């Protein structure tokens, strides 16, 4: 299990774009399960939609990608690198996510060759499917300052 400080030591995302609160399970280089507690105070609810708050689907996909980045970047060989989003295939949204929901984010790395790879992401709320997608990624080095 990884807490928020451990997650922040692995991936560079920060508020308001850090969309993973905890990693519950992790198998190095293979898979992870994370959670995002969706609060009524999320900044995106101010405009999406004020009278009927719904978490934007693209942010659910981003949360899955961040869990995938933790899987990839927590290994010693990739520590200190960046994981870039390279593509999305077969993405489907099945249910709305609203304030008070807890998103369970499961990502499995399907294949990785060199710095390119693909994973499968599944997001659920209370055991009900919210989103499923295939995520492509590219690993890169951080630029020198």
Swiss-Prot record:
Protein name: 3-hydroxyacyl-[acyl-carrier-protein] dehydratase FabZ
Stated role: Involved in unsaturated fatty acids biosynthesis. Catalyzes the dehydration of short chain beta-hydroxyacyl-ACPs and long chain saturated and unsaturated beta-hydroxyacyl-ACPs.
GO BP annotation list: fatty acid biosynthetic process; lipid A biosynthetic process
Organism: Geobacillus thermodenitrificans (strain NG80-2)
E.C. code: 4.2.1.59
UniProt record similarity statement: Belongs to the thioester dehydratase family. FabZ subfamily.
Record's keyword annotation contains Disulfide bond: no
Record's keyword terms, sorted: Cytoplasm, Lipid A biosynthesis, Lipid biosynthesis, Lipid metabolism, Lyase
GO molecular function: (3R)-hydroxyacyl-[acyl-carrier-protein] dehydratase activity
Record lineage: Bacteria, Bacillati, Bacillota, Bacilli, Bacillales
